[in-house]
UniProtKB/Swiss-Prot annotation:
Example of a GO cellular component annotation carried by this entry: large ribosomal subunit
Gene3D superfamilies, per the entry: 3.30.70.1730, 6.10.250.290
Keywords from the UniProt entry: Ribonucleoprotein, Ribosomal protein, RNA-binding, rRNA-binding
Organism of this sequence: Cupriavidus necator (strain ATCC 17699 / DSM 428 / KCTC 22496 / NCIMB 10442 / H16 / Stanier 337) (Ralstonia eutropha)
Cited PROSITE patterns: RIBOSOMAL_L10
Family of this protein: Belongs to the universal ribosomal protein uL10 family.
Function: Forms part of the ribosomal stalk, playing a central role in the interaction of the ribosome with GTP-bound translation factors.
The protein's assembly and partners: Part of the ribosomal stalk of the 50S ribosomal subunit. The N-terminus interacts with L11 and the large rRNA to form the base of the stalk. The C-terminus forms an elongated spine to which L12 dimers bind in a sequential fashion forming a multimeric L10(L12)X complex.
Domain of life: Bacteria
Protein name, per record: Large ribosomal subunit protein uL10
Biological processes, Gene Ontology terms: translation
Gene name linked to the record: rplJ
Keyword rRNA-binding (UniProt): yes
GO MF, one annotated term: large ribosomal subunit rRNA binding
InterPro entries the UniProt entry points to: Ribosomal_uL10, Ribosomal_uL10-like_sf, Ribosomal_uL10_bac, Ribosomal_uL10_bac_type, Ribosomal_uL10_CS_bac
Protein backbone atom coordinates (compact mmCIF):
# COMPACT_ATOMS: atom_id res chain seq x y z
CA UNK A 1 0.00 0.00 0.00
CA UNK A 2 1.51 3.34 -1.02
CA UNK A 3 2.20 5.96 1.60
CA UNK A 4 0.39 9.27 1.49
CA UNK A 5 2.37 12.52 1.65
CA UNK A 6 1.96 12.88 5.42
CA UNK A 7 3.22 9.35 6.05
CA UNK A 8 6.20 10.00 3.78
CA UNK A 9 7.03 13.20 5.66
CA UNK A 10 6.84 11.30 8.96
CA UNK A 11 9.17 8.56 7.67
CA UNK A 12 11.66 11.13 6.35
CA UNK A 13 11.56 12.99 9.68
CA UNK A 14 12.13 9.77 11.65
CA UNK A 15 15.04 8.65 9.48
CA UNK A 16 16.49 12.19 9.43
CA UNK A 17 16.51 12.20 13.23
CA UNK A 18 18.46 8.92 13.24
CA UNK A 19 20.86 10.20 10.56
CA UNK A 20 21.50 13.40 12.55
CA UNK A 21 22.80 11.31 15.49
CA UNK A 22 24.66 8.77 13.34
CA UNK A 23 28.36 8.28 12.70
CA UNK A 24 27.90 5.52 10.13
CA UNK A 25 25.36 4.41 7.55
CA UNK A 26 25.70 1.05 5.80
CA UNK A 27 23.60 0.11 2.78
CA UNK A 28 23.00 -3.51 1.76
CA UNK A 29 20.90 -5.22 -0.88
CA UNK A 30 18.46 -7.67 0.68
CA UNK A 31 16.88 -9.31 -2.37
CA UNK A 32 15.63 -12.85 -1.65
CA UNK A 33 15.97 -12.84 2.15
CA UNK A 34 13.19 -14.65 3.99
CA UNK A 35 11.05 -12.88 6.55
CA UNK A 36 12.44 -15.10 9.32
CA UNK A 37 16.03 -14.19 8.45
CA UNK A 38 15.16 -10.50 8.22
CA UNK A 39 13.51 -10.72 11.65
CA UNK A 40 16.70 -12.25 13.10
CA UNK A 41 18.73 -9.45 11.53
CA UNK A 42 16.44 -6.80 13.01
CA UNK A 43 16.68 -8.42 16.44
CA UNK A 44 20.47 -8.50 16.31
CA UNK A 45 20.58 -4.91 15.12
CA UNK A 46 18.30 -3.77 17.92
CA UNK A 47 20.53 -5.47 20.51
CA UNK A 48 23.60 -3.72 19.06
CA UNK A 49 21.93 -0.28 18.97
CA UNK A 50 21.65 -0.16 15.18
CA UNK A 51 18.63 1.48 13.55
CA UNK A 52 17.74 -0.87 10.68
CA UNK A 53 15.16 0.15 8.12
CA UNK A 54 13.90 -0.86 4.69
CA UNK A 55 12.51 2.18 2.92
CA UNK A 56 12.06 3.71 -0.48
CA UNK A 57 15.29 5.07 -1.85
CA UNK A 58 13.74 8.45 -2.66
CA UNK A 59 12.76 8.84 0.99
CA UNK A 60 16.25 7.80 2.09
CA UNK A 61 17.80 10.37 -0.26
CA UNK A 62 15.62 13.08 1.24
CA UNK A 63 16.57 11.99 4.75
CA UNK A 64 20.31 12.35 4.07
CA UNK A 65 20.08 15.67 2.19
CA UNK A 66 22.22 18.32 3.82
CA UNK A 67 24.08 15.84 6.04
CA UNK A 68 27.60 14.42 5.81
CA UNK A 69 25.96 11.31 4.31
CA UNK A 70 24.51 13.14 1.28
CA UNK A 71 27.22 11.72 -0.98
CA UNK A 72 25.85 8.24 -0.29
CA UNK A 73 22.68 9.10 -2.27
CA UNK A 74 24.32 7.93 -5.53
CA UNK A 75 24.54 4.39 -4.11
CA UNK A 76 20.83 4.24 -3.23
CA UNK A 77 19.43 2.07 -6.02
CA UNK A 78 17.64 -1.26 -5.84
CA UNK A 79 16.05 -3.00 -2.85
CA UNK A 80 18.13 -1.75 0.06
CA UNK A 81 18.19 -2.04 3.81
CA UNK A 82 19.79 0.82 5.73
CA UNK A 83 21.81 0.31 8.91
CA UNK A 84 22.30 3.55 10.84
CA UNK A 85 24.33 3.71 14.04
CA UNK A 86 25.80 6.19 16.48
CA UNK A 87 28.75 3.85 17.01
CA UNK A 88 31.26 4.00 14.18
CA UNK A 89 31.44 0.24 13.59
CA UNK A 90 28.28 -1.41 14.91
CA UNK A 91 26.12 -1.08 11.78
CA UNK A 92 28.96 -2.39 9.62
CA UNK A 93 29.53 -5.29 12.07
CA UNK A 94 25.86 -6.29 12.24
CA UNK A 95 25.31 -6.29 8.48
CA UNK A 96 28.70 -7.84 7.68
CA UNK A 97 28.23 -10.65 10.21
CA UNK A 98 24.78 -11.38 8.82
CA UNK A 99 26.10 -11.31 5.24
CA UNK A 100 28.67 -13.97 6.20
CA UNK A 101 25.91 -16.42 7.12
CA UNK A 102 23.35 -15.34 4.51
CA UNK A 103 24.63 -14.91 0.96
CA UNK A 104 21.47 -13.09 -0.13
CA UNK A 105 22.44 -9.99 1.84
CA UNK A 106 25.03 -8.11 -0.20
CA UNK A 107 26.88 -5.15 1.29
CA UNK A 108 26.75 -2.32 -1.23
CA UNK A 109 28.24 0.79 0.35
CA UNK A 110 28.51 2.85 3.46
CA UNK A 111 29.43 6.27 4.69
CA UNK A 112 31.63 7.20 7.60
CA UNK A 113 33.05 10.59 8.48
CA UNK A 114 31.58 12.14 5.33
CA UNK A 115 33.28 9.65 3.02
CA UNK A 116 31.56 7.05 0.88
CA UNK A 117 32.87 3.53 1.48
CA UNK A 118 32.67 0.65 -0.97
CA UNK A 119 31.79 -2.88 0.12
CA UNK A 120 35.43 -3.78 0.85
CA UNK A 121 35.86 -0.69 3.03
CA UNK A 122 32.66 -1.53 4.93
CA UNK A 123 34.02 -5.02 5.61
CA UNK A 124 37.30 -3.48 6.81
CA UNK A 125 35.34 -1.12 9.08
CA UNK A 126 33.45 -4.12 10.48
CA UNK A 127 36.73 -5.78 11.46
CA UNK A 128 37.69 -2.89 13.77
CA UNK A 129 36.84 -3.44 17.45
CA UNK A 130 33.96 -1.36 18.79
CA UNK A 131 34.49 1.52 21.20
CA UNK A 132 33.46 -0.64 24.17
CA UNK A 133 35.87 -3.42 23.15
CA UNK A 134 38.71 -0.90 22.81
CA UNK A 135 37.97 0.55 26.26
CA UNK A 136 37.96 -2.97 27.74
CA UNK A 137 41.31 -3.72 26.09
CA UNK A 138 42.77 -0.45 27.38
CA UNK A 139 41.57 -1.15 30.92
CA UNK A 140 43.03 -4.66 30.74
CA UNK A 141 46.40 -3.25 29.71
CA UNK A 142 46.28 -0.62 32.45
CA UNK A 143 45.13 -3.09 35.11
CA UNK A 144 47.65 -5.86 34.34
CA UNK A 145 50.67 -4.32 36.15
CA UNK A 146 48.59 -3.43 39.22
CA UNK A 147 47.01 -6.88 39.48
CA UNK A 148 50.41 -8.53 38.98
CA UNK A 149 51.85 -6.42 41.81
CA UNK A 150 48.87 -7.31 44.04
CA UNK A 151 49.41 -11.04 43.36
CA UNK A 152 53.10 -10.65 44.21
CA UNK A 153 52.28 -8.97 47.53
CA UNK A 154 49.72 -11.68 48.34
CA UNK A 155 52.28 -14.40 47.58
CA UNK A 156 54.88 -12.70 49.79
CA UNK A 157 52.38 -12.33 52.61
CA UNK A 158 51.43 -16.01 52.32
CA UNK A 159 55.08 -17.05 52.31
CA UNK A 160 55.83 -14.93 55.37
CA UNK A 161 52.76 -16.29 57.19
CA UNK A 162 53.90 -19.87 56.55
CA UNK A 163 57.43 -19.14 57.76
CA UNK A 164 56.38 -17.20 60.89
CA UNK A 165 54.96 -20.15 62.94
CA UNK A 166 58.06 -22.24 62.30
CA UNK A 167 60.29 -19.41 63.53
CA UNK A 168 58.10 -18.93 66.63
CA UNK A 169 58.37 -22.63 67.51
CA UNK A 170 62.15 -22.57 67.07
CA UNK A 171 62.48 -19.48 69.27
CA UNK A 172 60.23 -20.99 71.98
CA UNK A 173 62.13 -24.28 72.16
Amino acid sequence: MPLNIEDKKAVVAEVSAQVAKAQTIVVAEYRGITVGDLTKLRSTARQQGVYLRVLKNTLARRAVEGTPFASLAEQMTGPLIYGISEDAVSSAKVLNDFAKTNDKLVLRAGSYDGKVLDAAAVKALASIPSRDELIAQLLGVMQAPVSGFARLLAALAAKNAEGAPAEAEAAGA
